[in-house]
Amino acid sequence: KRKAGKTDELTESIHYGEVSAFITEFIKSHTYKLLERVAEELVEDMLQKFDGLEKVTLEIQKPWAPVGLPLKTVSVRITRSWHTAYIALGSNMGDSRQILDDAVSAIDALPASKVEKVSGFITTPPYGVTDQPDFLNGCLRMKTLYYPKELLRELNRIEKEAGRERIIHWGPRTLDLDIIFYDDLISQEDDLCIPHVEMHKRSFVLEPLEKIAPYKRHPGNGKTVRQMLEELTDS
């Protein structure tokens, strides 16, 4: 940790002895076939166990592995870190406030994830298909060890458990969860675009997002959330 290096304060550092003991106990108490699995599980547990640990590079070596070659060791080396994601939430069916509260709790309960901040919920008119009830919308900020596709899969599962049915595009829904930002990633795939491709056009996303991240910059257009909201409001 940089602060420990600048202040020489032990309390600002990660306790190396505790980390070493944790690794030793993990290796003793777990059995896996692949080094890759050992590395992934150990790093994930370390990041969740030790507060202030943001990124880990880990190498696991296996001496004299049976690979049919005169090698002293084979190894797996990985780097994993916490990521920051912003999620938009919406509902216009059932008890929407309870549904959104439950969704926040479900996201916070995900393994390898922590909800850090939640906006208030706002009531907004429907977008696209207008012949339907008003929506309740909000946004949250979370830390996660999931990669984008993994996070999307978990959000889709939470939607489904809340009764989400994908029948009418932009139609009524019990729960809608969208990844708006994921770090400063720019990615466009058939099933997932980050940042969300329509976010700059949607006041129901920008208004609650501005409450928790006014100065977060869009990695594509360079504008802050507040700037995008002001431009949309003025248009």
Language model region names:
Residues E54, K72-V74, P111-K117, D134-G138, ...:
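A generic structural signal for short beta-strands and their flanking turns/coil linkers
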Residues L42, N92, V118, P208:
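Residue-level signal for inorganic ion chemistry
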Residues K1-A85:
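N-terminal, polar/charged subdomain of small-to-medium soluble alpha/beta proteins
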Residues T84-V104:
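Extended accessory regions or peripheral subdomains of proteins
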